Amino acid sequence: MRIGIFSDVHANIEALNAVVDAFKSERIDKYVCIGDVVGYGASPNECCDVIRKVAAFTILGNHDAAVAGRMDYSYYYDAARQALDLHARQLTPQNMEWLKGLPYEVREGDLTFCHGSPINLEEFEYIFSVEQASRCLEIWDELGVVTFIGHSHLCKSFALTRDEVFEVVATKFVIRPEHKYIISVGSVGQPRDYDNRASYTIYDTDERTFEFKRVAYDIDGAAQKIFAADLERNFGNRLFLGV
């Protein structure tokens, strides 16, 4: 089975549509969204509608949790809170109820899907370094063979043995025996790795291969919608830079 995995759409329908179109040529059997459908961008309902239609399941992200009233988001900076408040007002009742019901984690066989670190799921902790990934050695026995995460907006992979963690730098690789993996799948709608293309990924359960993919999209169209909305202009400007 080929699973199309993506995360951190952040209300960017232009990027999401480009990713969905790109997936169509990849013989995908199932789609999974790892959260943060909303926040930052100008098209929260449109993104919810598409993801509800295509994804087999969606994981709760921190921005989703904030909009749905499932977490205290007072620690967010002012512009991010403003976007969350705006999206909470804009979402249809159906989309709001959907966000309220999203799970923190889904496990399927030897695969785990969660938005942030698999430790303390409700805390949405980041993993973008070997040091942060090393904390997962504490829960080695509970880890799936592959744990897919989002949250950092970075494309990062870490391979774990029982006593060691190292970063995997390849964009396509085979899951090796006697190892476990934590894979951060990047961001569809707000990449932060200085590559402004939307990120999406593919995991083949038969071949046991994982691959990062990128696709260009109408950044100007997405940014112009942000500029026209009651949103921080920098949320649009940063799309051009991928930061």
Residue ranges of each PLM-predicted region?
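Active-site neighborhood of phospho(di)ester-bond hydrolases with catalytic His/Asp-centered motifs
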Residues: 6-7, 31-36, 57-62, 146-151, ...
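Anionic-ligand binding region
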Residues: 132-173, 178-182
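Active-site environment of divalent metal-dependent phosphoester hydrolases
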Residues: 10-15, 39-41, 65-68, 119-121, ...
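Beta-strand-turn-beta hairpins that frame and shape the catalytic cleft
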Residues: 1-4, 106-113, 176-181
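Active-site neighborhood of divalent metal-dependent phosphoester bond hydrolases
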Residues: 53-120, 124-143
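N-terminal active-site segment of His-dependent metallophosphoesterases
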Residues: 1-54, 227
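Short, glycine/charged-enriched secondary-structure capping and boundary segments
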Residues: 18-21, 46-49, 72-75, 127-128, ...
